Curated annotation (Swiss-Prot):
GO biological process, one term: glycogen biosynthetic process
Keyword Membrane: no
Pathway: Glycan biosynthesis; glycogen biosynthesis
Family as reported in the entry's similarity comment: Belongs to the glycosyl hydrolase 13 family. GlgB subfamily.
Enzyme Commission number: 2.4.1.18
SUPFAM superfamilies for this protein: (Trans)glycosidases, E set domains, Glycosyl hydrolase domain
Originating species: Pseudomonas aeruginosa (strain ATCC 15692 / DSM 22644 / CIP 104116 / JCM 14847 / LMG 12228 / 1C / PRS 101 / PAO1)
Assembly and interaction partners: Monomer.
Protein name: 1,4-alpha-glucan branching enzyme GlgB
GO cellular component: cytoplasm; cytosol
Gene Ontology molecular functions: 1,4-alpha-glucan branching enzyme activity; cation binding; hydrolase activity, hydrolyzing O-glycosyl compounds
UniProt keyword terms in alphabetical order: Carbohydrate metabolism, Glycogen biosynthesis, Glycogen metabolism, Glycosyltransferase, Transferase
Catalytic activity as recorded in UniProt: Transfers a segment of a (1->4)-alpha-D-glucan chain to a primary hydroxy group in a similar glucan chain
Length: 732
């Protein structure tokens, strides 16, 4: 039978763990260690590199000097007859003196309810629980760090404040949650930090904080301590009316923006304050109701455009601080503009400092690559079936909606979440527990997300980028749907762009590409998206997709935008498309603003402003976007002339007539049936000279004739402009 260890042998063993970075329970050895049954005990501090350590009372008076156990060991200790209830340490370093409370003198930090809710996946305020929280604990100012790493042997917080030495601040493990915590006294705002984790297989790369509220400016990858948002909001009027403004009967016209490449200042990307000064007035001038920002969550690689984020709770430092971003959102609201953020719960990048293999195991991702790795994007896939990951993503969504007052989230790559075999060959995916291809865990998450958002942030939008025929994407969960407020109409986008790209002489053979979308236009609450994805990677800009010579390209573009704005569905247009940029979008540059010196480009911009004005002002164009009663075909079968015409309706409002001529041939005396006799006003002619068009086609006021056509008792005889749209409504 072996002899019991002596006290010196015991602390030598513990010291060895500290020196080797294997101390998983530092509070059992460091700080005040009370003698059994007494008031005295040993006080220990591990401070490698320190020369002297003095023990001070809470008023700063010296009580004793701690002795270094062995020269150069870094372990300072002293047995005291009475352990002080409060004390500080004065540490003499080779380059100066530091005075602070002892991190290992404080009790547990997180409450059991916080840990329970986190483990359950239902902690709605996770951003104020885990991560780095500036706080006052037991009367002392400092930062409380907390991170989930259940399979780590040891976790330390490292930063400039401890020379990035993982031996200095090992953390306390909280069982059974797997959360590690530590309060670092006197630490303040703006400190860079990461976590050093010891896994079962050895030391891991330094990890950024998954719940950091702020981050270092890339290419730096550290997290940054950040106070809770202090912004004084002035958007109460906007929030009070948001549910009405964003209802299905309201106009929704979205300007999609990549913040870093909209407009540069002195050759650099803009600051949030500069965007507030320039972007907001621009959006108001053009009449858009909302700005949709491509992901602003911190992301290491700018070339991902934000779609491979790692800081799910931190606005990117590229454009300013969290306070600056909040001020931008507030300014949008005060200007009557909503803000939607793109948000990515489907996958995350493999950067070493990120979430992948966070504690040496597949923590945030699935273990098996057939489930946990996306080969198209070289990214990990979130394991949303794990309650802690489910709760982490849910808390991220709520953080942006509640903390930053954003008005909606556009959920990226939903199709990749719904199907286990998405973009995989046979034999490269694992079925669900029923043997099917549906990702049941992701579906459960989307149900929960949409229900919680509807309950906790009324009126907020959750929009799905979903490219398959999954039924009921925008149907309520209670009715068997996924619960999104809207769905991008990817089918309409692909078909309409394919059609408009055809030579006008050949469009008669592709007539169905514009009529087909109306067969399912009311099956979901759709948004018609012309997004960034359509103007990159060799797809050409929207203007350059158009066939023909220069005049025809501009006419086609004006026609296409007019067709889009008169078609059922809410609207989304990517920046640069509104004035006909020739080049594809370049995320490293800025839009080609100089083009607005040319009348054709200015004409396109003026047309978009006119379309948005009509769209907002005329209920017929927006009130029944998702209802079949809001739409009536007049001409869908004139394949020979490539002409389409329809009526848009709203209860108690005049109907609106839209007529589109997709050939460069002017159609003189074209008869179209209308439901109402009398005079009709031409509200918009896309070929008007005001839009740098030729000025052809009907303008002003036209009178009906008592000659039935297209199932209507009355009709109008119109001159259709070449490659043009007419929008009309009854006069008066």
């Amino acid at each position: 039978m072996s002899e019991p260890m002596s006290e010196r042998e015991r602390w030598q063993l513990e010291l060895d763990k500290l020196q080797r970075g294997l101390q998983g329970d530092p509070f059992a050895f460091l700080g005040p260690q009370r003698d059994p049954g007494g008031e005295g005990g040993v006080l220990r501090a591990y401070l490698p590199g320190a020369q002297r350590v003095e023990l001070l009372d809470e008023d700063g008076a010296t009580l004793a000097e701690l002795e270094q156990s062995d020269p150069g060991s870094g372990l300072f200790q002293r047995h005291l007859e009475r352990l002080p209830p409060r004390y500080r340490l004065r540490v003499h370093w080779p380059d100066g003196v530091q005075e602070s409370e002892d991190p290992y003198a404080f009790g547990p930090l997180l409450g059991e309810l916080d840990l329970y809710l986190f483990a359950e996946g239902n902690h709605r305020q996770l951003a104020s629980c885990l991560g780095a929280q500036l706080t006052r604990h037991e009367g002392v100012e400092g930062v409380r760090f907390a991170v989930w790493a259940p399979n780590a042997v040891r976790v330390s917080v490292v930063g400039d404040f401890n020379g990035w030495d993982g031996r200095r601040h090992p953390m306390r493990r909280r069982y059974p949650s797997g959360v590690w915590e530590l309060f670092v006294p006197r630490l303040g705002e703006g400190e860079l930090y990461k976590y050093e984790l010891q896994g079962h297989d050895g030391l891991l790369p330094l990890k950024a904080d998954p719940l950091a509220l702020a981050c270092e400016t890339p290419p730096g990858t550290a997290s940054k301590t950040c106070a809770a948002l202090r912004h004084e909001w002035r958007d109460q009027d906007w929030l009070a009316r948001r549910a009405e403004r964003q209802g299905y009967a309201a106009p929704l016209s979205i300007y999609e923006v990549h913040a870093g490449s909209w407009r540069h200042r002195d050759g650099r990307p803009p600051h949030w304050s500069e965007l507030a000064e320039e972007l907001i007035p621009y959006v108001r001038q053009l009449g858009f109701t909302h700005i949709e920002l491509m992901p602003v969550m911190e992301h290491p690689f700018g070339g991902s455009w934000g779609y491979q984020p790692l800081g799910l709770f931190a606005p990117t430092a590229r454009y300013g601080t969290p306070e600056d971003f909040a001020a931008f959102v507030d300014a949008c609201h005060q200007a009557g503009i909503g803000v939607i953020l793109d948000w990515v719960p489907a996958h995350f990048p493999t950067d070493a400092h990120g979430l992948g293999r966070f504690d040496g195991t597949a923590l945030y991702e699935y273990e098996h690559p057939f489930e946990g790795f996306h080969q198209d994007w070289d990214t990990y896939i979130y394991n949303l079936g794990r309650s802690e990951v489910h709760g982490f993503m849910l808390a991220s969504a709520l953080h942006w909606l509640r903390t930053y007052h954003v008005d909606g989230l556009r959920v990226d790559a939903v199709a990749s979440m719904l199907y286990r075999d998405y973009s995989r060959k046979e034999g490269e995916w694992l079925p669900n527990r029923h043997g099917g291809r549906e990702n049941l865990e992701a579906i459960d998450f989307l149900h929960h997300l949409n229900q919680v958002v509807a309950s906790e942030t009324p009126g907020a939008l959750v929009i799905a980028e979903e490219s398959t025929a999954w039924p009921g994407v925008s149907r309520p969960v209670a009715e068997g749907g996924l619960g999104f407020s809207h769905k991008w109409n990817m089918g309409w986008m692909h078909d309409s762009l394919a059609y408009i790209g055809e030579d006008p002489l050949h469009r008669r053979y592709h007539h169905h590409q514009l009529t087909f979308g109306l067969l399912y236009a009311f099956s979901e609450h759709f948004i018609l998206p012309i997004s960034h994805d359509e103007v990159v990677h060799g797809k050409h800009s929207l203007l350059d997709k158009m066939p023909g010579d220069r005049w025809q390209k501009f006419a086609n573009l004006r026609l296409y935008l007019s067709f889009m704005w008169s078609h059922p569905g809410k609207k989304l247009l990517f920046m640069g498309c509104e004035f006909g940029q020739w080049r594809e979008w370049n995320h490293d540059g800025e839009l080609d603003w100089y083009l607005l010196r040319y009348p054709e480009h200015q004409g396109v911009q003026d047309l978009v402003a006119a379309l948005n004005r009509l769209y907002r002002e005329l209920p017929a164009l927006h009130a029944r976007d998702g209802e079949a009663l809001g739409f009536e075909w007049l001409i869908g079968d004139d394949q020979a002339n490539s002409v389409y015409a329809w009526l848009r309706h709203a209860a108690g409002e005049p109907s609106l007539l839209a007529v589109h001529n997709f050939t460069p041939v002017p159609r003189q005396g074209y008869r179209i049936g209308v439901p109402q006799g009398g005079d009709w006003d031409v509200l918009l002619n896309s070929d008007a000279q005001a839009f740098a068009g030729s000025g052809a086609g009907s303008q002003g006021r036209v009178s009906s004739e008592s000659c039935g056509a297209h199932g209507q008792a009355q009709s109008l005889v119109l001159d259709l402009p070449p490659l043009g749209t007419l929008l009309l409504r009854p006069a008066g």
